[in-house]
Amino acid sequence: ADGEGRLGDTVAAYRAAVAGADAILLTTPAYNGTMSAVAKNAIDVASRPRGAAPIVGKPVLVAAAVYSPGADERVLEHATTALRIAGAKPLERTFGITKHVEAFDEAGLVDKDRERELQALVADLLSPVPVS
């Protein structure tokens, strides 16, 4: 099923890393109005094998960096939906950055309020019971 007998070392190592993680921070750009294929594939690979998927029950903070205003909401919704279907436990709150080209400088996020917001979300993710 799903070609499980032909897994490479990279897939096995990735699944082991997901299994060993206390929590996951999934970040993605927007491509054609949704998450990147790499982010989607990361969710899909961690959702297998059925019955022993390493992503099941993992708390996940979803973050997206996009250019177009409003596009972050679509990307975050798509990623959160895929994670829930895969059995993960995405936080209710997500983090989106629009006009990402202008949002960062060499030191990080330009908007220090947004930086504090992200830090609080990561703290929630890493708390024993994630706050949604």
Summary of predicted features, one role per range:
Residues 1, 32, 36, 56, ...:
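Generic, ordered loop/turn and secondary-structure boundary motif
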Residues 6-86:
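Helix-loop-strand module that forms the ligand-binding subsite of alpha/beta enzymes
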